[in-house]
Amino acid sequence: PALVGKRWAEDLMAGMGWRFDPITGHVSEDLKRIRYLAQNAGAAKGLLFPNSLGSALLFKFGQIESAGLTTDCRSLLLSEKIPEPPKCHEVERFFHVAHEAIKAWGGTPAWDKVPKNLGLLLLKRHEAAAKNLMEKYSIPKRYAVLAPIARGLQDGQNKCWAHFNDLVGPLRNIGIEPIVFPNKE
């Protein structure tokens, strides 16, 4: 597969060995990149995870058939329209999109439920960086990452869960050190 996404995702996916082309936010450059993928890299179909109208427009004008959720009025631009699943975790939501796209394209999904391990491969430098950070900040082996970083509204409700601080005490009581990445808001 070839991946297209925000620049930060490139390093996250580096261990998978897949082609990655960044979307920079410069429409003409991004469109040129998508058209190149369509014409020269065998990218005939695109699975759109983000909910943005912009990604659907980019793939439509880039001449790549796309499958994705019918959010944000994207249904007119999608080749394969996938209805929003019932309320679920984002991992399950994105799995639903991929699962339904594979079926719509005539394939058979490898799993019908989200596997316990997503199979994301890390590079040695990722493992070394994590080890260095854990040593630098004295992070114990048992920890939980709390990252209340979502911003904005989804269906009229704040996307950032307001009770992250309430988790700190109970986690520590069972021997798990919370590592909190604060929200900038």
Question: What residues fall within each predicted segment?
Answer:
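Catalytic machinery of carbohydrate-active enzymes
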Residues: 1-185
